[in-house]
Amino acid sequence: MSTFLYRTNKIEAIFDYAAIARDFTILLVEPKETDDGSDKDFSFYQNPILDVLIQDAHALASVYMQGRCMAIFPKADSKLSAVLAKFSRRYTEYHIKVLDEASLLSPFVRHRLFGYANRLLLQLLLASVCNYQTQELQYHNVLGQIYLPMEIKEDKAGYKNCVCLHVSVTAGMYLSLSVTSFRQIDPANIPKGPLYLIEKDSMRRYLGSRSRIPKEEQAILFCQKSSRFTHNTIPFLDISSRAALHETKVGRFMEFMDMASRRLAPYLTISFVEQPFIRIGDKMKNPPVLEPASWNFVDLIQSPLSVLTSKLFLEYLQNQYPEYKITPCSEVNPEVPTLLLFHNRRYYRHDKQGKLVEDVSLPYRANLRTQGITLEALCDIFRLKTKKPTMPDKDLRKKQKMWDGTLRPLLAKLQSELRIKEDIQNRRFTVFHPQDYLSEPWTYVLPQKETRQDSANPKKKKTFFHFYELIMDPNTEAIAFRYFNEASEGLSRLEAKMVEDTKAFYDYGKHGLGIRLNYNETLDGFICPGKDPAMSYMIIRTNSFLLPDYTDMPMADLKYEIPAKELFDAFEQEIAQSSDAIYQAELSGWMEQIAAKQMEQGLTDLSLQLIKDAFKQTKAVVLPSAKTGAEATPEEKSKPRRMNGTIGTQLNQFIGRVTNGHYLFTPKGEKDLQKYLMDAHLLGHACRLSRPVFYKEQLEEMRDGIGYVAGSNTSNSRYTIPRAMIIRVILPSERNQVISDEMFKTYFSQLTVHYVKTGYYTVLPFPFKYLREYARYYNACQNIEVEAEDEEDEENVMDDE
């Protein structure tokens, strides 16, 4: 057995956003909303604006993906402003925006525009170094697609075909290599009409522009395609004499990556992710000096036969390869690879009629075989009978060659780390590795429906939707929060479509729905904290996690104190910087109330309770020109003042900023979300948990020692499964308690699974990465001020100003 590091095709890119913003201008082109509000798919192919960006505006590169186009220009281009102004007048159906430095430095803007790990930005920069307008013959770029010419061949008709290596950045920051070819058309037969430049035998990719073919360029390679649009070509000059024609794909690719790394060095650092590879077989004559390697071995079966087989298997490995430490583990170390031992058996489920049928929707068992070893395979290797186990021969060394030949293809699978990745189309789960959990940013939209009277027909009721949008970027562990409803103006096409999809789902399924926008999949992840730590639990699904923005949740510790001078200085500075007269008057009135209370009590440090009481005693500032409405009722007058409206939000954000995150009031729309979270109502709303499903005994069999979450499936007309607390998470409730790694280990050991009744459940992974964030949020929730019972009906929706 030998180990070495091999370079994968996964890219790790570290960007210098300030340098990019300093030297480049990035242009964003998006289609405008249609006047009739229709949600038809918009295509850029009907308009040559992408070609104009390259031909007329001289963009270094442009990339098109998911309904938007981006182009990159050198900052020193003085004519760019005039060209963009002309484009805006000519192409009125597009939004043409220049990304400023603040947008480029914002992680949320980058996530929305460039995707996970800024994939599109990497593709844009890579494409910019091989602009096909130059005389460089080595690399060519069309709309972000990178082609490395390798060889020119002639077909039977005498036409040349240029074989190219196509480089693209795929999801997950993997560099994908494929081979495609372009065919030359006889220049004498070039029609006056427009041309498509396409891959041979394929129409998958748009590669065009609007220029005519210069007659002097006899070696241009392109394919003719009847089209009413105008497109360009790639000038592949005659490269048949190049010595690099017969180079390998990898060599050609690495040549390009080395060049790109040098030219982009001031703006980003590109590196390949390396992984360890273990080769099982004869020992090397001169094995490299390696550090001790460790592996997790998890017995998912936990039967007497599996214990016996595991012991024999591990003894064999220890005898043959003493330099490696492979031991059974009760706690999986997420830093090292894991090998699973599981059953190779069939699984069953209930159909709609309640009959027990084989579940053929679990092809992930085949995937397990690529990541682990079945008990049946080990029994066959060691000649153990599955019905009546017997010990193999004592002399294991005599069977070394036979075992080596059998184990080599099995243990070679250790080169891959265990990951859980859900195949969305097949609805399947594979093996889980904590490090890979939540590796991509996602946008989560939680709808909440409200029944209203139909104004057109008072006898009927209609459903109205409120939405809470959360955007999380695991790379920065930052969360954005936004509230809107179906009547909100300025919704994007994607959000408008999401509203319609949500309505359709409610009409069809009668259940709550979470929509993960960037994958168009159902997202079923809910966090359910109870009234005390022992009652807290999570229902979570692969690659999903619902966590409110804890910086915007009401986290105020009312006993927290701030020096009076520091607070008053902050008030005066905020008043001086603001240009809003009402906001300034609100701040002045609030500061006067605080100063009066300070003088009355003779304090040097002011508590948040005092600051909050002072605000409740101030009167709202109203413009003299404001229309006077109906007089407030006595009940309304008796309610304590809250931070409502736009001004209230500014005041709340101001005091939260001054007190380092201690917000006094709940911002707009979040109180309902808070209520649902604390009362665990989200689970009660029949969240749709996906297949695969398992029975209790099968859950016992699949328990892997890490701790997982299982949630009850939704009810149907025949089977009704009550809401069940499947797992509980023990978290600290003491304030300011530091969560250490030792405490994490304690939590893992305390994870217990409770089976309420025999039924089928959905197996879900435990969110290791965000346990710390959940603990912080849970502790913050303990400090929330509980309103009096007679104030529970108080309206919490802020008035728009």
Report residues per predicted region.
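Long, contiguous domain-sized segments
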Residues: 1-241, 248-256, 260-269, 274-275, ...
